[in-house]
Amino acid sequence: MIRATARSAAAPDRLWSLASDVERWGDRLPTVDVVRPLGSGLTGVGSKFEVRQPGLPKAVWQVTDWQPGRSFTWVSTSPGIRSTAVHTVQEDGDGSRLDLSLAWSGPLARVLELLIGRKARGMVETEARTFARLAEQA
């Protein structure tokens, strides 16, 4: 499992507003080219998004847990692999903390980890740091 944590002087609601606005990740994160909703309405459990990231095949992610102001989980599946990403915002003293995790399961999980594990770790760490920095700038 890949984990990354970033602390921010910003209030938790500000950090949440950035991390949960997945449709704008392409504008905010160097690790994401574009996120396109596959459907309409508010983001919540069942929402699906097509995500394109540099050097990775496009993936469809579906929200499986949505706790407004606190956390969301989404899952992407492809043959032999299930990817699960969790995004959690918490109060941390006078500011906030963002915890990100990415886990792979399935018969090809170990192969994927060997192929892109280092790259994925760097991307998750970059995302955590970027959201924390952007929250402080707003």
Regions found by a protein language model. Name each.
Residues D27, R36-T84, D92, R97, ...:
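Glycine-rich portal/gate segments that line the openings of hydrophobic small-molecule binding cavities
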Residues A10, D27-P30, K58, G122, ...:
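Generic recognition of short, well-ordered alpha-helical interface segments
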Residues A6, L98-L102:
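Short, hydrophobic/aromatic-enriched beta-strand segments in well-ordered soluble domains
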Residues A103-A138:
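A conserved amphipathic terminal alpha-helix motif
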Residues M1-S40, E136:
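Hydrophobic ligand-binding cavity/cleft-lining segments
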